[in-house]
């Protein structure tokens, strides 16, 4: 592949290191891997070690937690309205948590610095 894009899903993978190895395997030399996701502070070291492959050269590394919080704030009311109007009351709390609205677990973790949102880009080394 010329490019692999992974957005907000790798935190659910059982083996991040294996995922990164597979990305490296399927990328053509010179290909790009773009990744954005969230991590708890406790998981950062494990995640960083998964990215430490000789074949992948880090070309962009940015913490975008502040921007994500701002985006969540900007769409808070719209999400709350959509949930109230379209989701059965019995499961609205779960939807609010999943949506990251204000006072949800993930929103509070970002605010308190217990979780971060990261953006990285890599290029596969050309041999």
Task: Name every feature range the model reports, one short phrase each.
Residues 2:
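Conserved acidic residues
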Residues 5:
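A conserved beta-strand element that flanks and buttresses the S-adenosyl-L-methionine
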Residues 56-67:
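Conserved S-adenosyl-L-methionine
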Residues 65-127:
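Conserved Class I S-adenosyl-L-methionine
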């Amino acid at each position: 592949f010329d490019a692999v894009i992974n957005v907000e899903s790798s935190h659910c993978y059982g083996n991040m290191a294996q995922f990164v190895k597979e990305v490296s395997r399927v990328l053509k030399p010179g290909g790009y891997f773009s990744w954005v996701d969230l991590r708890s502070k406790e998981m950062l070291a494990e995640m960083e070690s998964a990215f430490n492959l000789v074949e992948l050269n880090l070309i962009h590394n940015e913490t975008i937690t502040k921007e994500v919080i701002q985006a969540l704030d900007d769409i808070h009311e719209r999400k709350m309205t959509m949930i109230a109007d379209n989701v059965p009351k019995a499961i609205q709390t779960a939807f609010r948590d999943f949506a990251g609205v204000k006072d949800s677990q993930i929103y509070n973790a970002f605010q308190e610095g217990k979780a971060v949102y990261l953006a990285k880009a890599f290029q596969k080394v050309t041999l």
